[in-house]
Amino acid sequence: MPFSVTIPASRYTEVDKRILPTGRRPDVEGTPYDLRYGRLMGEAINDDFPGYDNYFHLASDDDIEYCGKRLRLAAEVLGEALAMSVLTDKGGLQFYTGNFLKDGPDFFGKFPRIKHGALCLETGEEPGIVKEGRGFYDAGEEYTHTTVYSVRKRQDNP
């Protein structure tokens, strides 16, 4: 089933072959990481580009009021019949496309385990920021953030 992913991010966190952050945050312009205008995943992931497992730094300033909180669009996934929007108050999200899933026993006995057969959108802090002295919380300090996953039937579906 074809689907597209849009992530309004101007930069991403580069990772090495072990999927560890390098500390570099390149611009997405002109790269497979440019998902600002939506990309079909079947076209984006191929022999030359093995898939996504990166943190995207959101560039959207279009805040949305939701239950008294200011949230921004982090991602939108459009399938044939359904659409999903992800809203957050964080500065980015990790996008993963099941690069390391191997054919094997089905999940829960009925969902096939297929490479690139799943995607994950996780809002939160950038991986590896503790190396930069960020992302620490004191004992007893409360940490909260808000993420909303909204799934709807596509109205423009023929």
Which residues are covered by each model-predicted region?
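An exposed, glycine/acidic-rich loop-and-rim segment of catalytic or binding clefts
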Residues: 1-158
